[in-house]
Amino acid sequence: MFAGPGGLGEGFSTCVDDHDRPRFHSVVSIERDEFSHRTLFLRHFLRSFPSGEIPDDYYDYLNGRITADEMFRRHRPQFNDALKSAVKISLGPETHDEVRRLVRNRLAGRKKWALVGGPPCQAYSLVGRSRMMNHPDFAHDERHFLYREYLKIIIDHRPPVFVMENVKGLLSAQVEGEPVIRRIVTDLAKPKAAMEKRANGLGYRLYSLSEDEQPDEHVDPRLFLVKAEEFGVPQARHRMFIVGIRDDIDVKPGRLRRHKPPTVKETIGHLPAVRSGLSRGKDNPEAWRREILALTAGSLREQLNGAHYAKAILGRIRLHVSDDTFPLERFAMRYPGRPAKRHRALTAMHDSRLSTLHGHEARSHMASDLRRYMFAAVFAEVMERSPKLSDFPESLLPDHRNVDRGRSGEMFSDRFRVQLPHQVSTTITSHISKDGHYFIHYDPIQCRSLTVREAARLQTFPDNYKFEGPRTSQYHQVGNAVPPYLASQIADIIADVLDSMSDGG
């Protein structure tokens, strides 16, 4: 449920046993957003083929040789399978009966299955929450309680196991003085009591995926927090995962096993270098390089005077702008070889049949931002940290009303954030669709924010995973998704639970 572009589903579908046989089959995924659903549908279409037998037509589609419609026409049985399993519906009271029939028909009496998904409690995201909390309609906005639709699905179908994913902001959110997470935990443990005000009935034991101590209705909800970077994902992504096991099933889930993630450079460093575009005026390699060279022509030396890092940064900037290896193109189509780092997350991304690297096109930026990006990347290269606004010379400061407050550390002092090469990235969020200031590439000569493909790699999506729709939507899809590599590890735990059940369910 609430499938988005399919990160959770991808992880569950790629979870295999010791004989490389899939442990899960996705019988239905539901999503309401047009472009996310198109991405989801395409992936379900591919999964309708036997494992390892993606048709050549898919790669021709990625290469632009045929259209999606032509590909679907050539493979009608798989297209029809995807029509049944990837469904575009907006969950709510008006579609409840339709969803109930759909899920019942697709389950077809199966006893061993899992319900996965993250009801979109957008109001509790840490981003923008302070603005929403004081809104007079906040407590009564139906969007914030879409998880109740999730509860209705649990009541209707009594899944043996569910996995609910949501944002870290749930830990601190309150509505009318009540902690939201406490209410959600209570409701998930006794969904029928929550919806029908009954004292007993359907119940679930709730478990953490990352901690040995077992949560209950009164325990610290932070036990449900999963830090993706602790489990091999090259990104500091902290999300809530609550596993529910039906009361009549006497099985406890295992735990995720901590292991080291690859770094940003190990994950995206071997992708071809591309330059950003100029959003105003003529955009060509010469004009772009001219704007970069302007960084050394101003009063940068005087403005950095006194800073202990001034000489090193100025020297490094001159070195980079005199380099003849500036990338000339805004996009790269050539698919690179395997990354040098051997890591399960990186190996899972690679597809030797690819010849085209999809989604590796840099967005356009204002000329002033290009110079800010180069300064920020050089600063990070020298100082091994991303600069704060107080580190920027005045000539590079944005014309923004909050700059002074940012320089003093009051708010958004890290408005320009470099993704450091030898660490994991910061959280890839849907905000990347609006601007790239928080997602600056560490290579100074590229002067740009991350491409869709780089963001997707940091989210551990396979390189053959195509995101449909305009680029803004692609960024949004990537930022909102669950990393498939993490989802696959969760799927292993859930599969073990289901395998331990008696055949009677």
Stretches with model-predicted labels:
Residues 354-469, 473-475:
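Polybasic, glycine- and aromatic-enriched phosphate-binding surface used to engage nucleic acids
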Residues 2-5, 34, 119-121, 168, ...:
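Short, flexible loop/turn elements at secondary-structure junctions
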Residues 6, 10, 34, 38, ...:
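A structural signal for well-ordered alpha-helical segments within the folded catalytic domains
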Residues 27, 112, 223, 237-241, ...:
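Extracellular structured ligand-interaction cores
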Residues 470-505:
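Generic C-terminus detector
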Residues 106, 126-399:
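Class I S-adenosyl-L-methionine
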Residues 3, 7-157, 168-182, 215:
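Core alpha/beta nucleotide-donor-binding catalytic domains of modification enzymes
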